[in-house]
């Protein structure tokens, strides 16, 4: 029974990672809107960073726990494939989702980085204009 509990924990940690990556992706969309909005405040931008930072920390914790448990149950999964066929298939599907979401998040991060560079370049130009006019 303990082995089945470990396998369930593995699956649940992958499900949680999918959930967290979806949250990060949604927050990236919010961050993109904030960066594109000339009236957005620095606090709004910082809130998106803070949210993502928390979720990234949660993912790191999940990954560490997953690795530790996987090492314990890897032989079991290899030796009893028929017994765990459904769980293995579900976990493979979750890993595919995680890969797709990770790729999506990385793309969003690159796009937001470019938006941030543009926004901060505009802020610098405004600051220079103000200094010159004084």
Label for each model-derived stretch:
Residues 31-39, 73:
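Secondary-structure edge/capping motif, primarily at the C-terminal ends of alpha-helices
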Residues 43-53:
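Short, charged, amphipathic alpha-helical segments
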Residues 81-134:
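Short terminal interaction segments
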